[in-house]
Amino acid sequence: MQPESSQREETPSLLWGLDPVFLAFAKLYIGDILDLKESRQVPGVFFYNGHPIKQVEILGTVIGRREKDAFYSYGVDDGTGVINCICWKKSNNAAPSSAAPALGVLNLTSQLKKLQETIEQKTKIEIGDIVQIRGYVHTYREEREIRVTTYYKVDDPVCNIQIARMLELPSIYRKVYDQPFCSPALEQERAFSDPSALDLASLTRLLSERAKEFLAENKVQTFYQQELEIVESLLSLANQPVIHGAGPEQGDSKSDTTSKAIHSIFKNAIQLLQEKGFVFQKDDGFDKLYYVTREDKELHRKIHHIIQEDCQKPNHAEKGCHFQHILACARLSVSPDLSEGVLQQVLELLEDQSDIISTTEHYYTAF
């Protein structure tokens, strides 16, 4: 549920577009949608833990149904709450043509009619049906509701889709919605205007982002932490939280403390890059050498070879290889410590290069 930090001051509306949640259909529990606080700046925009939200996606059971002249109203329950969903009826203004259609047109019309029947079957909702709904959050007469843009009935006889949703949402909440929005660009601007405004965690994130930019711009393949610590632009940023005024008699002590603090903040910044898969270590990091994921051509070649070989097997020929299968094979043949983040970075790069494609979510096949 929504943490207490959601009560803090709203982010200025000009900065909402920097938060990717703002433009996405947020997968929230209905109970949290009912508790969202509406923006004081722009009506129709709501906040969850500082994230601006205007559109959501829900999955639940229909427990109520009302029909009006212009719309259907469905009560949807996901176990955390019940929300009203407004589905507008489509107006059928197409006038029938009096001219006799040609054979090709007749065949096309027949196909379109079948498609329309399928759509009507999927969108004919009754009480007890499982539905997936996307739409805009709205408040009408002080009651929270969803103005639906797309919806369909979910065929889920053995509850696979519902179980997958139950497993997916806690992870999304933990990684996205419950994390306060932090923009590296904004933190960088704040650091230059007022260095004291950043706490150590914010400065570490900013240093991590700047280090990533440095590695990408210079196409660095491998590096030691000490090599980053002597980069002037990074060092000046890392110095900010540990610069203190000191008398002559305390100079050596402060210098030692500052040196340790700088080493620590660089270590934590690199650890953030490791967690996201931008860099990694081999052989348990025994030699303390870091490899840049996007520059390790040998790793790319091995991952591509795994997908290429396994996609020729009958059980992977149709859908391709699942992410977890690729990860398991890579840990056997490449490195037992290969992280999901590193593999995700490699897969995205291979997909950008058109070496592989994503057939469905989390499934990949190679050419």
From Swiss-Prot:
Any keyword Nucleus?
A: yes
Which biological processes are named by the entry's GO terms?
A: telomere capping; telomere maintenance; telomere maintenance via telomere lengthening
Where is it mostly found?
nucleus
Q: What is this protein called?
A: CST complex subunit STN1
The similarity annotation says:
Belongs to the STN1 family.
Q: Which GO terms describe its cellular component?
A: chromosome, telomeric region; CST complex; nucleus
Task: Give the gene name.
Answer: STN1
Origin organism is: Ailuropoda melanoleuca (Giant panda)
What Pfam families does the annotation carry?
STN1_2 (PF09170), tRNA_anti-codon (PF01336)
Which PANTHER family does this chain map to? Answer: CST COMPLEX SUBUNIT STN1 (PTHR13989:SF33), REPLICATION PROTEIN A-RELATED (PTHR13989)
Where the record puts its DNA-binding region(s)? 56-154
> What would be an example GO MF term here?
single-stranded telomeric DNA binding
InterPro entries, per database record:
CST_STN1_C (IPR015253), CST_Stn1_wHTH1_sf (IPR042082), NA-bd_OB-fold (IPR012340), NA-bd_OB_tRNA (IPR004365), RFA2-like (IPR040260), Stn1 (IPR014647), WH-like_DNA-bd_sf (IPR036388), WH_DNA-bd_sf (IPR036390)
Question: Is the keyword Nucleus in the record?
Answer: yes
Which keywords belong to this entry? Chromosome, DNA-binding, Nucleus, Telomere
The entry's function note states: Component of the CST complex, a complex that binds to single-stranded DNA and is required to protect telomeres from DNA degradation. The CST complex binds single-stranded DNA with high affinity in a sequence-independent manner, while isolated subunits bind DNA with low affinity by themselves. In addition to telomere protection, the CST complex has probably a more general role in DNA metabolism at non-telomeric sites.
Q: Tell me where in or outside the cell this protein is found.
A: Nucleus; Chromosome, Telomere
What's the superkingdom here? Eukaryota
